[in-house]
C-alpha cells in the first residue's frame, strides 16, 4: 500500500482519469420495471423530470475528467442510442475524447446476445484495447448517484490493487439483490458472494450487509488476462459478480472502495445517495424524492451538474380555465412545455410537454413526456408512461381492485399505466 501526500493526490486526480477508459454496461432490460421497459432499455428510462437514467453515469464520467467512454448496448437500444447521439456529442475527437456505442459483436456462433456482464466487455475487447488505457472503469448504466471516479482511481493506485470494487452498506433484507462482500482491516476483499439467499451481516451491524455497487476499477492488462481466461471457461456464466470478482477475491487481488470516500454531495454529513431504481416502487419513490423540500439527491449542485439532451421548449405554464379555476402546483417538478389548466398538482413529477386539463387532481404521480390528461381526472400514486392519453374522468390510484384489473399494480400499491394498457381497456369498453 502506497501513502500519498496531498499534492500527489491532486496531481493523480488530474492524471488518472486521462489514463482511463470508462465502460458503461447499458444493455439491461430491467424486467422488474415491468412494462416501462418493454420498448426501451432500463438505462434509457426517463428520470427526474428531464433526464435519462444513463445520464448519471455519463455525467459522473464527464465531471470526473474521464473523456473516453464506451457504452455497451444490447436490449431495445434505439432510444438509448438516439439519446446519446443527440445529447452527448460534446467530446472533441481531436483531443481523443469520445463516447463510443458498442453493440453486441455476435462473434460467437449461435450467440446473438451477451452471455453475461463480463462477456459484454470480452466481445468488445478488440475495440477496447485500441483505447490504450492503463485503467478500465466499469460502470452500471442504470443507477442514480453522483460519484467522483478520480477519487476511486486514486484509492485503487494507493492500495496497489489490481481490481477495486465500490461498496456501501445496505439493509440486510435488500442484500439478496447484490453481491455481498467481507473485507479485512485494509479493505482487501476476503469473501464475495453474488446475490446470496442469506446475506452475511457486517461486523458490528447485524442489520446491514456490505454490498457491491457494480462499479469496478481494473488495471487494464489484468482485466484483459482475466477475460481471456474466463472466455475459455465453459463452466463460467461470464459475469463479473458471479465469476470474475469471486475469482479475484480467491487470488487476493481485489480491494473494496467505500462509496462515502468518492460520493459527491452538498452536505458532507448526509447519507451517501445511491439508488438502484430497479423496481416500480423504487423508481416512483426516487422520482418523487426530488420534488421534496430537501431532496436527498442535490440536482442543483453547479459544481457537479447532471447533463442531458435538451430540447427547445417553452416554459411551463399554469393557467386559469374558463370557469375561473387556477392551475396550481405544490412540491412538484414541472418541466418545460407543460401546461396545467385549472388543476392541482401536488408532490408529483411532470416531464416535458405534459398537458393537464381542467378540474384534475394529480397527487404523488410521475407523468412521463407528452402525457395528456383529460378533464376531471384524479391520479394518485402512479407512473404514467410516455404519450399516454388519460380519458376524461378517469380515476387511478384510489381503487386497488379496479387498478389491478385495468393496469399493473405493484404489491406496494404503485400503478403503472402504458399506452398498450389503455388501448386494451378501450377495446374492452367498446365490446
Swiss-Prot record:
Catalytic activity: alpha-D-glucose 1-phosphate + ATP + H(+) = ADP-alpha-D-glucose + diphosphate
Positions of alpha-D-glucose 1-phosphate binding: 114, 179, 194-195, 212
Keyword Transferase: yes
SUPFAM superfamilies: Nucleotide-diphospho-sugar transferases, Trimeric LpxA-like enzymes
Could play a key role in the communication between the regulatory and the substrate sites, annotated site positions: 74, 113
Binding residues annotated for AMP, in chain numbering: 40, 46, 52, 370, 386
Keyword tags: Allosteric enzyme, ATP-binding, Carbohydrate metabolism, Glycogen biosynthesis, Glycogen metabolism, Nucleotide-binding, Nucleotidyltransferase, Transferase
Gene3D superfamilies membership: Hexapeptide repeat proteins, Spore Coat Polysaccharide Biosynthesis Protein SpsA, Chain A
Presence of keyword Nucleotidyltransferase: yes
InterPro entries tied to this protein: ADP-Glc_PPase, ADP_Glu_pyroP_CS, GlgC_bac, GlmU/GlgC-like_hexapep, NTP_transferase_dom, Nucleotide-diphossugar_trans, Trimer_LpxA-like_sf
Binding site for beta-D-fructose 1,6-bisphosphate: 39, 419-423, 429-431
Coiled-coil intervals, chain numbering: none
Molecular-function GO terms, alphabetical: ATP binding; glucose-1-phosphate adenylyltransferase activity
Leading EC class: transferase
EC number assigned by the record: 2.7.7.27
One GO term (biological process): glycogen biosynthetic process
Top-level lineage group: Bacteria
Annotated metabolic or biological route of this protein: Glycan biosynthesis; glycogen biosynthesis
Activity modulation comment: Allosterically activated by fructose-1,6-bisphosphate (F16BP) and inhibited by AMP.
Family according to the record: Belongs to the bacterial/plant glucose-1-phosphate adenylyltransferase family.
The protein's assembly and partners: Homotetramer.
PANTHER family hit by this protein: GLUCOSE-1-PHOSPHATE ADENYLYLTRANSFERASE, GLUCOSE-1-PHOSPHATE ADENYLYLTRANSFERASE-RELATED
Function: Involved in the biosynthesis of ADP-glucose, a building block required for the elongation reactions to produce glycogen. Catalyzes the reaction between ATP and alpha-D-glucose 1-phosphate (G1P) to produce pyrophosphate and ADP-Glc.
Entry-linked NCBIfam families: glgC (TIGR02091), PRK00725.1 (NF001947), PRK00844.1 (NF002023)
Name of protein: Glucose-1-phosphate adenylyltransferase
Taxonomic lineage: Bacteria, Pseudomonadati, Pseudomonadota, Gammaproteobacteria, Enterobacterales
